[in-house]
Curated annotation (Swiss-Prot):
Name the UniProt record assigns to this protein: Acyl-protein thioesterase 1
Keywords assigned: Cytoplasm, Fatty acid metabolism, Hydrolase, Lipid metabolism, Nucleus, Serine esterase
Keyword Flavoprotein: no
Catalytic residues identified in the record: 125 (charge relay system), 181 (charge relay system), 213 (charge relay system)
């Protein structure tokens, strides 16, 4: 994966900056793809103390796109098929590079003076998958983790990567999924949620009938409510 990265799209806090949300886009998208959702969250609920960071994935060769470059957090070698096959074909190197990137992004916010419990990491599809992995393996306790239409990466070895005393063992995790998702099957997300629950993580799982690989207003409203709950105004 290329080390060259475009600086994230940033929505500064409208008042004193006391919290940060890092929201991560999916394959082929950019941070701009989620700008309108962020603008709605900011406008409707007046999260004036929250800074929103929308990172941009680097342009990398994507196997399912005939090796052509597109924005991606890691390579996708196959779409569809059984879960075991999908896991065997994970781009472990690319995943770990992005995991490090998000850990560094979180640390930058902490270094700027934001308490880690006032940071939420979340995303959609590939971005949600990275958020789950990076969030749960972060050494600082976060305020919350969100995975929309996503799944747990490195699931076969995840249990060996974590321990009961980890900082984010009790961090609230919310996973949302469309029941008609043709790209990341709902069952894959459900298995991920069940695996995490089995390991003792605080995971809430919700599905949306008729929803494909996308986001619907009801889901975005629930994300908004989660952010308000985890990041209430301090001033």
């Amino acid at each position: 994966m290329s080390s060259g990265r475009i600086a994230p799209l940033v929505f500064p806090a409208a008042s004193q900056h006391t919290a940060t949300v890092i929201f991560v886009h999916g394959l082929g998208d950019t941070g701009h793809g989620w700008a309108s959702a962020v603008e709605n969250w900011r406008r409707r609920q007046k999260m004036d103390e929250v800074k929103f960071i929308l990172p941009h994935a680097p342009q990398i060769p994507i196997s399912v796109n005939m090796g052509m470059r597109m924005p991606g957090w890691f390579d996708i070698k196959q779409l569809g098929g059984d879960v075991d096959s999908l896991i065997r074909n994970e781009d472990t190197e690319g995943i770990k590079l992005s995991q490090k990137y998000f850990h560094n992004l979180i640390q930058q916010e902490i270094d700027s003076g934001i308490v880690p419990e006032r940071i939420v990491l979340g995303g959609f599809s590939q971005g949600g998958a990275m958020s789950l992995l990076a969030g749960l393996t972060c050494t600082s306790k976060l305020g919350g983790i969100l995975g929309l239409s996503s799944w747990l990466l490195l699931s076969k070895t995840f249990a060996d990567m974590v321990k009961p005393t980890d900082a984010n063992r009790q961090t609230p995790v919310m996973m949302f999924h469309g029941e008609e998702d043709p790209i990341v099957p709902c069952e894959r997300g459900k298995l991920s949620a069940e695996l995490l629950k089995g390991l003792g993580y605080d995971v809430a799982w919700k599905t949306y009938p008729g929803m494909g690989h996308s986001a619907v207003p009801e889901e975005l409203d629930e994300v908004e409510a989660f952010l308000r709950k985890q990041l209430p105004p301090k001033n």
